[in-house]
């Protein structure tokens, strides 16, 4: 019924909140915009997040130290510094205790994982189960993805 209530990080890509749940109980009579809250990467316990996210192309020639600083700042702003457990493969590597359903809507993106890299084309679907990962835009235009993140107990 309108644009996303909240967004953050448009200068490097961005997160655009559509809907959030904070548990398993849903009040069907309230009219609260559940996306109009502070943006954090992960959903709360037993909660979920439904969002768009945009990945801008990485400018050529940016030193890895600068990319590390940008990534650290971006994750700090969304309460996710603790999710950056191993950034040796890419500065934006992170891991959440969630199951994620992600669809690439437009663009040319590579999903970097600990053991492999997967190049995606529009309409490809990714199911992530608590993996350490990063996204890289291979194109000249911003890439747009949509994601559902569901809090999970990983084993």
Which residues does each PLM region occupy?
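N-terminal leader/capping segments at the start of a protein or of a new domain
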Residues: 1-34
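A broad, low-specificity signal marking well-ordered, structured residues that form hydrophobic/aromatic
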Residues: 16-17, 50, 102, 133
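Non-heme Fe(II)/2-oxoglutarate
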Residues: 22-35, 40-43, 151-155
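Conserved short histidine dyad/triad with adjacent acidic residue
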Residues: 49-96, 129-132
């Amino acid at each position: 019924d309108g644009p996303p209530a909240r967004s953050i990080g448009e200068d490097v890509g961005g997160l655009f909140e559509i809907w959030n749940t904070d548990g398993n109980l849903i009040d069907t009579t309230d009219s609260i915009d559940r996306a109009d809250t502070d943006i954090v990467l992960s959903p709360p316990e037993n909660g979920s997040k439904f969002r768009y996210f945009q990945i801008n192309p990485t400018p050529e020639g940016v030193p890895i130290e600068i990319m590390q600083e940008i990534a650290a700042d971006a994750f700090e702003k969304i309460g996710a510094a603790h999710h950056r457990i191993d950034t040796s493969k890419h500065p934006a590597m992170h891991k959440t205790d969630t199951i994620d359903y992600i669809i690439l809507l437009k663009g040319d993106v590579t999903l970097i994982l600990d053991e492999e890299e997967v190049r995606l084309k529009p309409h490809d679907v990714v199911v992530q189960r608590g993996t350490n990962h990063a996204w890289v835009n291979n194109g000249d235009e911003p890439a747009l993805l949509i994601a559902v993140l569901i809090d999970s107990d990983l084993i």
